[in-house]
Amino acid sequence: MARKNQKAPWEPEEEIIWVSKSEMKRDMEELQKLGEELVGLKPAVLEKFPLSEDLREAIADAQRFKNEARRRQLQRIGKLMRYEDPEPIQAALDKVRNKHSQATAALHKLEMLRDRVVEEGDKAIDDVMELYPEADRQRLRQLARQAAKEKKAGKPAKSYREIFQILKALNEEEI
């Protein structure tokens, strides 16, 4: 005799997650807002985003539309966004937003490294060589000595700036 509505003990339990209608609406509104932010970006920037072709076309259309047509197109973009994975799109958008602050942080890091090269000498240069093996050790040592002399004599920091330019060029090559 067959059992009805019973699972065998070896079958895994399926957990059903109930989502309220309000929560679904909030999620859809978030996707639509993400779509609005994408519409505000330049086409050259959008090329770097992981978007489907339909979504790319909808965004391009929304950028051309005005007022009511734009509002309807944004709703369509929100609908298309439901079929996309929003996490990589959000990550790419965050990267675009924080591009300036990331560049500033990288420059501060290079400035601190330059200060260490001038103050600590060979020990800091060894650290630079670990980070950037293609760096010219001899030139860095020479510039570090010159920068220390310039600082002591109160002269303009020509070598100090040149060390920074070398580190900046090495950092850009690595990227």
UniProtKB/Swiss-Prot annotation:
Chief location of this protein within or outside the cell: cytoplasm
Gene Ontology biological process terms, A to Z: assembly of large subunit precursor of preribosome
Localization annotation: Cytoplasm
Protein keywords: Cytoplasm, Ribosome biogenesis, RNA-binding, rRNA-binding
One Pfam family this sequence matches: DarP
Entry GO MF terms: ribosome binding; rRNA binding
Gene Ontology cellular-component terms listed: cytosol
Homology family: Belongs to the DarP family.
General function of this protein: Member of a network of 50S ribosomal subunit biogenesis factors which assembles along the 30S-50S interface, preventing incorrect 23S rRNA structures from forming. Promotes peptidyl transferase center (PTC) maturation.
NCBIfam families recorded: PRK05255.1-1
Name of this protein: Dual-action ribosomal maturation protein DarP
Originating organism: Vibrio parahaemolyticus serotype O3:K6 (strain RIMD 2210633)
